[in-house]
C-alpha cells in the first residue's frame, strides 16, 4: 500500500449545530471510500460526536483524530473573534481539549457561541496541536490587514507556547481573500520557519450537498435563501475532496499536504470505552461489599416484620427470603456493583426523609430482593414472582440500571443533594439532541425557500403528528403526499430538500432524567455543555455514549402521578390531623380493598394512572379485574401485540370460565408449569414466565433463561437453533417427552415476542392501584390534586370537572378569599376551584393577592382588594378575568356591578397609593386614609343575563360552573321531546323512535377497522347524559351539527350500552335548536303593556326584528292595558327566524317574561 499523501484535519459534522450537515458515520464511510488512513472531526466547541466517531473510525479501519474548532479572543484584537483548530496529540492533549471546551461553556456565551481566551492555551498547551484558522485566524486577519507588528506578536505567542505544534493553515475553497492570505502566509512561513498545512474546511460530504448546507445554515440564522442580507460564508468547494483532488489543488505547496500526514501520525489518543467507573460510596472502615451485605440484611428484617406481623408465619417464610437475598448479594458483589446499589439506596432514602415522593420502582429493578430490602423498591419480588436475573444476569455482564421515579416538583432537590454529596464537579446531567423532524423540517425548508405560509402549511399538515414520524412513513400513511409530490414540482423540490435535512442535529438540550456521578471530575471523562449563562452543565456525550465512556448513569425520572399522590396526601393528612387521626401512609394500604376493585370493575377510572383511556376502560369492563395480579396483567395486556394477537380474548375467556385453562395449551401442556402460569390463567404473558418455563422444563439457570428470552426477542435463526437444541436436551434429562418439549418451545417462542416485563408491570400497577384507592376513599382530595396537575390544560380540567360532577362531588367557583393557586378541599369536603386555573391570570397576580390576604386578612370588597394589592401586578385585565370567573362573587352584589365598578376601584386604589406615598414623607406625620376609610360604592346596574354569566365562565374557566346553558331552553325543549328528560329515558322497542335533546358536551368522528366513519356525540341536559351514534348516512347528513356547546334535538332508537352501562341512541334525525323552532313553533309572542309602548320602544322593536325577516314564524304582538287585551298579528313580510340572537335581543329590550315561542 502506498504512503498516504493527504489527511483531512478540519471537518464539521452535524454536531456543529451552526453549519455542519453530515453525520459522523457517513463522514467516516466517505473517508474510507476515498482510501483515507485517518480523519479529524473538529466540531465547533464540542466533542459531542466523539464516541460515535471513535467507534465508527476504528470499525472502518480509519484512525480517528480528536479535535475542535474554536472562537478565540485576545487583548491584542479587542472584541474581534478569530478562529483556531485544536487537535489532541495524546491523552494529555485530549484532557486539555476537554477542559478548554468546558471552560468556554462555563463562562457563558452570546450569539457568537462559546469563546476561549487565547491565554487559556498557555496553561493547557500540553499535548495540543494548533491549526491557525486560515484567513479567519488571528495571524490571518493581521496578514490581510498588513499589520506586521501584530503578526509578529501573534506568531511569537505560538512559537513560545506551541513550538513545532503550530501550523499555518492554508485553504483553497474559492472564498474571498483566500488566495491573498495564502500567499502572505507562505511568505511568513518561509521567513519565520513556520510549518504550513492544507485543509479543505469541510462542511459536507459531496459538492452536491452545498444547497442543503446553505439551507441548514439559513434555518439556524433565520434568513431566507434570497435575502440579500444573508451572510454567504461558505462555498460549494467545502466538500470532502479526495487525496488526488487535494494534491492537485496544492501541487505548488507539497509540504502543506505532507504535514497533514505528519500531524495525523502525531495524533494518538486512546479513548477508554466500555469500562465502568463508579464513585466511591462512604462505608467507614468496612468494605463496600460487606457494607452492602450489612445494610441489606438489616433492611430485610424490617421488611419481613412488615410483611409478616405474625412471628410464627415470619419464621416459616424467612428461609426463602434469606436464601434469595444471599444469592443476589453474591452476584452483585461478584459483578462489582455493590457501590451502585448503595448510591441508589442513599439518594432514595434521603428523598423519603426529606419529603420527596419516590415511586415504588420501575423496570426490571423491581425484581431484586436486595433492592426491596434497601428500600430502593417497594414491591416484594417473591410475592409476585419477579426475577432478579431479569435485572442483573451473571451470565451477561452489563451495568444494572435502576429507573427511579420522583415527584415532578421536587426531583431537582434530589439532584442537588447528589451534587452536594459527591461534589458539583463530579455530578452532571446528560445532553440530548433535537433533530430536524419530518413536520418541522418541511416548515423550516419551506420558509427558507420563501414559499407562502399556506403552501407550506398544507404540506406539513399532511404529515401525521405521531412520535417518531418520518417523511418515508408519512408517504406510506397519507395517500395525498405522494399525489401532490408527483403533481407539483415545487412540492417535489421542497420535500426532496427536506429529505436531505431530515434527522440532522438541530439543537442541544437536557435529558429528562439522566444524571451521571463520576469518581472524579466529570471533565476527566467528558466535556461539558452549559446554557448561555454558563449554568446547568450537561455532559456533551448523550445517554448511550456517556455510559460507553465509562460514566454510570442514574435515571432521575419525574412522574407526575407521584406529585398528584403527594398533593392529595397533604390535603388528606391535614384533614386527618384535625380529626385526631394518624397520617395516611400510602405504602401501607391493603392491596385487596373491595371498594377500590368495585370502582375498577365499573370502569370508573378517569384520572387513575394508566387506566383512564377509553381502550383501557373497555378492557377493564371485559376483564372485570378483582385482585392485584389482574391489575398487573392489565398493564401488560394493554399493548398492541397482545391486543392484536388474540391473547387478550383468550385471557378474558379463561378468567371467566368460557375457555378451558391449560398450561399453556390444551393439546400441549405440562403440570409442572401450573405454578408458573396459574396467575395468568395459563397464558404466557410475562418475560419472567418465559424464563421460568425454561428453568422448570429444561433445567436452565435463570441467567441462561434470560439469554434464551433475549434470543427469542431478536429472532436470530442460528441462535434460536442453538437454544432449541439446549432446550430439548434439558427437557430430555428431566424426563419430558421430546415432542411435547418442542411444541411448548414453539409456543414459548411465539408468545415471547408479546411478553412484557412483569417487574415493570407490577411496579406501575402499584402506582395505578394507589391512585385508584385514593379515588375510592378520598375522592375530593384526589380529584383536586389531579386538576391541579392539569391546570395548564383547560380541556383536561373540563373533563375532570365533569368526572367530579358524575362522582357527586361539589365544586365551588374560584374565590378571592378562600381560594388558593391550586385546587383544594375545604372543611366541608367541597373542592374549591384553583385560582391558577383561570385563563389569563398568571402566578404573579395570584401571589400578590395571597400575600395581601395573608398580611391584612380577608378582603371586604373589590375596593379593599384594589387598595391593598399591587395594581401593577393585578391590572385591569386580570381583575376582569377574576370577576368573570366568579372569584369576586362574595365581594359584591353581582358580576355586572363589579365589572362596572372596576374603573372606580382602580382609580381609588391609585389615589390611595399616592396619598400614602405623600403621607410617608410628611414631616408632620399626616398619613393617608386607611383602606377601610376609602369611600366606595358599586355602580347601579342590572345583573347580567344568565347566558352572559355562563359565557364569562366559559371564557375564563373553559366550562360552565354555576349554571348550565341548557337552563334557558328547558321549557322550550319540553315541547320537542314530550317532557322526557335524559335521566328518564329507557331502551325503545324495535323500530320505535324517541326524541331527546341536550347540550353537546363532546363530539368526535372515528373510523372503524373496516374503514367506516361513525359520529359520536354526548348530550347533556343536566338531568343525565346520552351518547348518540351517527352511522354513515346520518353522519353524511348531519356531521356539520356535531359541534361542542350546540343544543341538538335528536330522534332515533335507544338501546343499552354494554360498555358504559348506560344508554345510547342510534340517530335517524338531528336538528339544532334553530331548526327545531322553525319546525315546531307556531309563532313568536311579544307582550307589551300600555305603560311600555312609546315611539322609541316601537322603533327599537322594529330594529331588532328587521335582520331576521327571512324566516317562516309569524310574529304576534299582545297588547295589555287595564281594561282590555288585544292580539295583533304582524303581516307575512314580518315572518322571522327565531334565533337565539333575536330572542335575546328582544328579552333584553322588554324583559324575559314578555317574549316566548308559541306552540300548538
UniProtKB/Swiss-Prot annotation:
Q: Which reaction does it catalyse?
A: DNA(n) + a 2'-deoxyribonucleoside 5'-triphosphate = DNA(n+1) + diphosphate
Q: Where does it localize?
A: Cytoplasm
State the top-level EC class: transferase
Where does the source fall among the domains of life? Bacteria
Naming one, the record's GO cellular component terms include: cytoplasm
Coiled-coil ranges (or none): none
The record, for CDD domains, names:
DnaE_OBF (cd04485), PHP_PolIIIA_DnaE1 (cd07433)
Q: What is its main location?
A: cytoplasm
Q: Which GO terms describe its biological process?
A: DNA replication
Please state which protein family the record places this protein in. Belongs to the DNA polymerase type-C family. DnaE subfamily.
* Known partners and oligomeric status: The DNA polymerase holoenzyme is a complex that contains 10 different types of subunits. These subunits are organized into 3 functionally essential subassemblies: the pol III core, the beta sliding clamp processivity factor and the clamp-loading complex. The pol III core (subunits alpha,epsilon and theta) contains the polymerase and the 3'-5' exonuclease proofreading activities. The polymerase is tethered to the template via the sliding clamp processivity factor.
Query: Under what name is this protein listed?
Result: DNA polymerase III subunit alpha
Gene it is expressed from: dnaE
